[in-house]
């Protein structure tokens, strides 16, 4: 739901505006299914806006196998934000049903993407009536920024916006530890901690297989290995007959 405004008992949007004007820090996630015009107006002051539609990855190595909407984005290379300091960027972050974020150059604002789709990604706009996940005419082309940091240089206010509402659940942390460390890095940067102190893992890190890798492994185990076994067996039979 959106923030309430002046016609409500509590003017949440004015409170948020005052907080940011005083140099406040904001970490938020958003859903492609939710409309929040009050909040969007605040984010526009930082040059940030929603890109219409749900991002679908066209590069199978950048999404989970057979799930092109479950994105495995690339990390950005920020020079001002410290959100990725100490984050192990070799681990995957997974964003499912995500939306892009556009960045418009704005006076007195510095903004940097932290997570990006590949250039093969595209956006499906009519998400309530999808008939295919394949690219169609009219789909917006990537790459898309999926998480963005911005700072107002006058007030010191910072916004860190992630265009996915479900990356911060406990079950996902178990299978995608990169989500947890990314969020830890984001939170640490907003409270002035430049380097993320990694905690000792209590469980073995699960293996995440991208779509292209999974397909190659599937072909290997279904076709290549059985064929190799049959060929080897035929060779053994022929050698025995010659004896």
Placement of each model-derived feature along the sequence:
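Acidic, S/T/G-rich, low-cysteine, solvent-exposed domains in lumenal/extracellular/periplasmic regions
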Residues: 1-195
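Short, aromatic-rich amphipathic segments at membrane interfaces
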Residues: 167, 172, 194-221
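Alpha-helical transmembrane segments
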Residues: 226-240
